[in-house]
């Protein structure tokens, strides 16, 4: 009788340890998914910013340059167009 109770308690303890480890693994997986979502969002923002050329970046027309920049006709790089805004 005592051995059956001991085996049952040991089984319950083992089950609790396995469930706890599974829960920790689930939390780590959730953290990785959230981290991946944040990184993907950051990459998407950077990709949108990369669609234009920055100051002194090479260009062939004004549309290649970022906001407040224009393409210099002789040197073909983006320079400030002289405008201000917020």
Swiss-Prot record:
Cell compartment(s), UniProt: Secreted
Protein name: Omega-theraphotoxin-Hhn1f 4
Signal peptide start and end residues: 1-21
Pro-sequence residue ranges: 22-50
Similarity annotation: Belongs to the neurotoxin 10 (Hwtx-1) family. 17 (Hntx-9) subfamily.
Pfam families recorded: Toxin_12
Role, per record: Ion channel inhibitor.
Disulphides: 52-66, 59-71, 65-78
Gene Ontology terms: cellular component: extracellular region
Entry keywords, A to Z: Disulfide bond, Ion channel impairing toxin, Knottin, Secreted, Signal, Toxin
InterPro entries: Huwentoxin-1, Huwentoxin_CS1
Main location class: secreted
Domain characteristics, as noted in the entry: The presence of a 'disulfide through disulfide knot' structurally defines this protein as a knottin.
């Amino acid at each position: 009788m005592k051995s059956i109770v001991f085996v049952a308690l040991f089984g319950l303890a083992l089950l609790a340890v396995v469930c706890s480890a599974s829960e920790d693994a689930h939390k780590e997986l959730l953290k990785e998914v959230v981290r991946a979502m944040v990184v993907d969002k950051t990459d998407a923002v950077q990709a949108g910013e990369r669609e234009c050329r920055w100051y002194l970046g090479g260009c062939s027309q004004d549309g290649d340059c970022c906001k407040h920049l224009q393409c210099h006709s002789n040197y073909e790089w983006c320079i400030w167009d002289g405008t201000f805004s917020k």
